[in-house]
Amino acid sequence: LDALAEQGIRLEDIDAFSGYCGAMGPTVGGIFAIDDTVCEHVMNAGVNHPAILGAPLLHAFAQATGKPAYAVNQPDTDELADVARITGWPGVYRKSHVHCLNQKECAIRCAAELGMGYEEGNFIVAHVGGGLSVACHEHGRMVDTNDVLEGAGPFAPNRSGDVPAKPVVKMAFSEGASKKQMDGIVGKTGGLLGLLGTDDARQIIERIENGDEWAATVYDAMAYQVAKYVAGFAAVVRGKVDGIVLTGGVSHDPRFVSYVTERVGWIAPVKVYAGDFEMDALAAGAIRALDGKESVMTYTGEPSWKGFACEGALPDVEG
């Protein structure tokens, strides 16, 4: 509020409030009205993360002003197709943890650039920043993606990505690695950081320019894996891809962009929206809601995926 006051903006002058709302649980993508149900759910979700404060703050502003408050493409959005959830390990299913807000915003921008609506086309978006997510957007839904939190997909600046299972089992049981160590490699100290000692792409690019062959090999391997995932997701929509998007901080680098584009440009036009557009996405979502261009949904707390309905399906080991 102090920051608004310093800019001469009164809370009452704002037409709508839009924010990053964590701990809502799996829902479809889109815009949800922030109400008592949302606030009660997120504050009792048992999640210790600053993102849980988004909904209560927005709701307080809305109540104080009588203006609407929205959650736009919230981080737990899960729209995976059933076939994308299956793994070969009984009871272990894939879930969607992805940079949803920036993913969808960039797909919307790509669609507009190509002269179509987001729901009209198929897009593959690779967000490469501190984390790395690749998602297939089929007519407005992210039907397949890697799981950023659970250690799936291409390796990232500080995350391990896909790895062969048996060496990991050996680390845990034969070499005595602790759960903390292994969780760290999966989500904090793996990837470029583990291999090169830094997760700063700018430092790595400088090393490559100075002749560091190992840095070049590792960095290109990350781009290689991104390209492989993008090409694989083209099969999800039977090759009918309208646009491919590269976004996130690493997409500022011409070497990375060139490496990926050379390998996937034959599939569809490659658009580059370097950096992230989460603040823009929040504002754009609120504007779509106010203009009536996108429906505002009511949050129920019911997850978008409750398990497989077919007979014989094994229960999720995580409940």
Regions of interest found by a model, annotated:
Residues 241-260:
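Glycine-rich phosphate-binding loops at beta-strand->alpha-helix junctions
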Residues 16-19, 68-74, 124-126, 136, ...:
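General beta-strand structural signal in soluble alpha/beta enzymes
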Residues 184-238:
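Adenine-nucleotide phosphate-binding core of ATP-dependent small-molecule kinases
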Residues 251-252, 271-315:
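Glycine-rich phosphate-binding/hydrolytic loop that grips phosphoryl groups
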